């Protein structure tokens, strides 16, 4: 079973890989990425994200949590 950190890394990797180029999902200011809310639950066998409403709610809790994850991804590009 994947650890919590492994799961979070997979979610963020999938999000950045799939949604970074989609219009309107990211807003950049001062080198920080803001406001994402795409629902991602897990990766399928082809590495594509599988979305559900449940995970949309889970990952849309707070803007500050989103900003913290975006800052982590920017400051540690090799982490994900």
Language-model regions, residue ranges each:
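Terminal leader/tail segments of proteins
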Residues: 1-80
């Amino acid at each position: 079973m994947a650890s919590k950190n492994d799961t979070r890394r997979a979610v963020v990797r999938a999000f950045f890989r799939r949604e970074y180029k989609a219009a309107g999902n990211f807003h950049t200011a001062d080198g920080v990425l803001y406001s994402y809310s795409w629902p991602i639950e897990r990766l399928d066998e082809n590495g594509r994200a599988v979305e559900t409403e449940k995970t949309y709610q889970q990952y849309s809790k707070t803007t500050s949590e989103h900003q913290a994850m975006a800052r982590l991804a920017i400051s540690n590009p090799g982490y994900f």
